[in-house]
C-alpha cells in the first residue's frame, strides 16, 4: 500500500478542541497542522512546533528507554496507546522486536497481577455478573461502533498465573494490540472484553484496591447462562464479529469452543492458535531435520485443553501426510501430573480420552512405578519431539533431555509455557545438554544461545505469528466461521515462511521484523481455505489480495476536515 497516497485521503471529524485531543483514535498531538489547529480550535492547546510522526516516535522511544523496568515500560506504552493510538502503533512498528515482550508476554503477566494498582484509564468493556441484565446497554456504550474483532476473557487462567479476576483484562488489550501491530487490523475495529464473574484468588478478594466484583466465581449453570447472554448480545450488536476466547480455565475453554464455534465466527487462541503455531513450527522443524511430521514420535508434558488441542492438530497433519488416524494416535504420548494418559486412568475429560495410549501396548515397557512418568516415556517411547505446556518450571530436567538425545540425534524440544518464570527448561540448558544438536522453540522470548562459538537463535513459538493473520484473513474474506481447515492453512503458511526450513540456517520462525508480511501470507491462505470450505464467498486471488491490503491498517496521520454531527 502506498503510504503517501493513503495519507492524502482526508477524514471528516465532528470533534474539536480538548475533546479531539482526548480521543486516542484521532489525536495527533504535536503533529496537527497549522490549518487543522485553526479549523479544530486547537490553538493554544499545543506547543508551537508542528512535528512529524517520526519526530514524535524519536521522543517517545527516548522516554521509553529512560524507564528501567519492563513493567514501567509497559505502563508507559499503555499510556501512549490511551493518548494517541497512531503514534503507539508507529512506535511499535519501529521497535517491534524490542517492544513485543513489553506489551505482551512475558511482561503482560505482571501487568495483569498488578492491574488494579497500575490502572490509569478505562479501555474496553467490563461486563460484571451483577449487571447481566444490562449487557445490551453495555455493548451500546462501547466507544467503538463498528467492532469487527473482540477478544474476551473471564480472567480465570491468565498465562501460567491462574485466576487474576478482572486483572485478566491486560490479556485482551495486549492481544488486540498485536492484531493491529502484526496483522494490520484497525484499532477502530477492536474491542477487549472481560467477563467479571468474580474471583477465587484470595489475594484479589482481600485487596482493598481490587477493582473487580468481590465475590467467589460463579460456576455451573449460572456461569453458562451468563456467557450465553453475552454471546447473544454480541450477535445482536455485531452479528459478523470475529470473537476470540482467551485464557478461560480448562473446564470451560473446550466446552465453550464446542458450544459456539458453529454459532458464530469464533475461535480459542489458547487451544487453536497455540496448536496452529506449534504445528507450523513442527512442520518446519521436521523439514529442517530432514524428515516429515508423520515420522515424528511426540511427547507432551501437559494434557490440558491447550496440549490436547495441539495434539489433535498434529494428528490431522499426520493424516494429511498419509497416516491413518490410529497410526497417528500411537505416535502421541500425553503426560500430565498423574503420568502418561492411558486407557486405564479414571476421570479423564472427553478431549483427553481420545489421546490415551492402550496400556496393553505398553506391556514391554520398563518403568519405575505403576504411574508412567515423563522420564519413563522418554526411555521407552524414544520421542523425537518434546513439547511442554504444563505451566510448571524446570520439568524438562537434564536427565530427561539427555535421555531423549541418546535416542534421537536431532531432538525437537519446545518448552512453550509462559511467562518466562514458568518455562519447562531454559533454551541455553537444552542446547548444552544436547551438545548443540536440539532444535528449540520456546513460548517466551529468549536471547540467542552461544555454544562452542556458534550462535543458536531461539524461535519464540508465539501465537502472534498466527492469530493476527487469521483475523486479517477472516476480515478480508468475510468468513462466517473459523474452520479447522483455515487453521491448518495458517500452520502450513507459517511453516513455508521458516528461514531454517527454507534456507537450512537461521531461526525456525521468521524474524519479528517480517511479521506483517507473514500475517499477509497467512491471511491469504486462511481466506482461500474459507472459500474452499464454503464459509466465504468465492473471489479471484487478485480480489482477495486487494481485500487483504484494503483491510491492512497502517499507522499514518491522515488530514482532517471539519464536519458536524
UniProtKB/Swiss-Prot annotation:
SMART domains with a match to the protein in the record: malic, Malic_M
Keyword terms: Metal-binding, NAD, Oxidoreductase
Cofactor note: Divalent metal cations. Prefers magnesium or manganese.
Lineage: Bacteria, Pseudomonadati, Pseudomonadota, Gammaproteobacteria, Enterobacterales
Entry keyword Nucleotidyltransferase: no
Residues given in the record as NAD(+) binding sites: 157, 270, 418
List of catalytic residues: 104 (proton donor), 175 (proton acceptor)
BP terms from Gene Ontology: malate metabolic process
Name of the protein this chain belongs to: NAD-dependent malic enzyme
Subunit architecture: Homotetramer.
Record-linked InterPro entries: Aminoacid_DH-like_N_sf, Malic_enzyme_CS, Malic_N_dom, Malic_N_dom_sf, Malic_NAD-bd, Malic_OxRdtase, NAD(P)-bd_dom_sf, NAD_malic_enz_proteobac
E.C. no: 1.1.1.38
Gene field: maeA
Essential cofactor(s): Mg(2+); Mn(2+)
Amino acid at each position: 500500500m502506498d503510504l503517501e497516497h493513503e495519507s492524502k485521503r482526508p477524514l471528516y471529524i465532528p470533534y474539536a478542541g480538548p475533546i479531539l485531543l482526548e480521543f486516542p483514535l484521532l489525536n495527533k498531538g504535536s503533529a496537527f497542522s497549522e490549518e487543522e489547529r485553526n479549523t479544530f480550535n486547537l490553538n493554544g492547546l499545543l506547543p508551537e512546533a508542528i512535528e512529524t510522526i517520526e519526530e514524535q516516535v524519536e521522543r517517545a522511544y527516548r522516554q521509553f528507554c529512560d524507564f528501567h523496568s519492563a513493567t514501567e515500560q509497559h505502563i508507559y506504552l499503555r499510556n501512549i496507546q490511551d493518548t494517541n493510538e497512531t503514534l503507539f502503533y508507529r512506535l511499535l512498528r519501529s521497535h517491534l522486536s524490542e517492544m513485543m515482550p513489553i506489551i505482551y508476554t512475558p511482561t503482560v503477566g505482571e501487568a495483569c497481577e498488578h492491574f488494579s494498582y497500575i490502572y490509569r484509564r478505562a479501555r474496553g468493556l467490563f461486563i460484571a455478573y451483577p449487571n447481566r441484565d444490562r449487557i445490551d446497554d453495555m455493548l451500546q456504550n462501547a466507544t467503538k461502533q463498528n467492532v469487527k474483532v473482540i477478544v474476551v476473557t473471564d480472567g480465570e487462567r491468565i498465562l501460567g498465573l491462574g485466576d487474576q479476576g478482572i486483572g485478566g483484562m491486560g490479556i485482551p488489550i495486549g492481544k488486540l494490540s498485536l492484531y493491529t501491530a502484526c496483522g494490520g487490523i484497525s484499532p477502530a475495529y477492536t474491542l477487549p472484553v472481560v467477563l467479571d464473574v468474580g474471583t477465587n484468588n484470595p489475594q484479589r478478594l482481600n485487596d482493598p484496591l481490587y477493582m473487580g466484583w468481590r465475590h467467589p466465581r460463579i460456576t455451573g449453570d449460572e456461569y453458562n447462562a451468563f456467557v450465553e447472554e453475552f454471546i447473544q448480545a454480541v450477535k445482536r450488536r455485531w452479528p459478523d464479529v470475529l470473537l476470540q476466547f482467551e485464557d478461560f480455565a480448562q473446564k470451560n475453554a473446550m466446552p465453550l469452543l464446542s458450544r459456539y464455534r458453529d454459532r458464530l465466527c469464533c475461535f480459542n487462541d489458547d487451544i487453536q492458535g497455540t496448536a496452529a503455531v506449534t504445528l507450523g513450527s513442527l512442520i518446519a522443524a521436521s523439514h529442517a531435520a530432514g524428515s516429515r511430521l508423520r515420522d515424528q514420535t511426540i511427547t507432551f508434558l501437559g494434557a490440558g485443553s491447550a496440549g490436547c488441542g495441539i495434539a489433535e492438530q498434529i494428528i490431522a497433519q499426520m493424516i494429511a501426510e498419509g497416516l491413518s488416524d490410529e497410526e497417528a494416535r500411537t505416535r502421541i504420548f500425553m503426560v500430565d501430573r498423574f503420568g502418561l494418559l492411558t486407557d486405564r486412568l479414571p476421570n479423564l475429560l472427553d478431549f483427553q480420552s481420545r489421546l490415551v495410549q492402550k496400556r496393553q501396548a505398553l506391556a514391554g515397557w520398563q518403568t519405575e512405578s505403576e504411574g508412567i512418568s515423563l522420564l519413563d516415556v522418554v526411555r521407552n517411547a524414544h520421542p523425537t519431539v518434546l513439547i511442554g505446556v504444563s505451566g510448571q518450571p524446570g520439568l524438562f530436567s537434564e536427565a530427561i533431555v539427555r535421555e531423549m538425545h541418546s535416542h534421537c540425534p536431532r531432538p525437537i524440544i519446545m518448552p512453550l509455557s509462559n511467562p518466562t518464570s514458568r518455562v519447562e527448561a531454559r533454551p541455553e540448558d537444552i542446547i548444552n545438554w544436547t551438545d548443540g544438536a536440539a532444535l528449540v522453540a520456546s513460548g517466551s522470548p529468549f536471547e540467542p544461545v552461544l555454544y562452542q562459538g556458534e550462535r543458536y537463535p531461539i524461535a519464540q513459538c508465539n501465537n502472534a505469528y498466527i492469530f493476527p493473520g487469521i483475523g486479517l484473513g477472516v476480515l478480508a474474506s468475510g468468513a462466517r466461521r473459523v474452520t479447522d481447515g483455515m487453521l491448518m492453512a495458517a500452520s502450513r503458511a507459517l511453516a513455508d515462511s521458516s528461514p531454517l526450513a527454507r534456507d537450512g540456517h537461521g531461526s525456525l520462525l521468521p524474524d519479528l521484523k517480517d511479521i506483517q508480511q507473514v500475517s499477509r501470507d497467512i491471511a491469504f491462505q486462511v481466506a482461500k481455505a474459507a472459500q474452499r470450505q464454503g464459509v466465504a464467498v468465492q473471489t479471484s486471488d487478485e480480489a482477495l489480495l486487494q481485500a487483504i491490503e484494503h483491510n491492512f491498517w497502517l499507522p499514518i496521520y491522515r488530514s482532517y476536515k471539519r464536519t458536524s454531527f
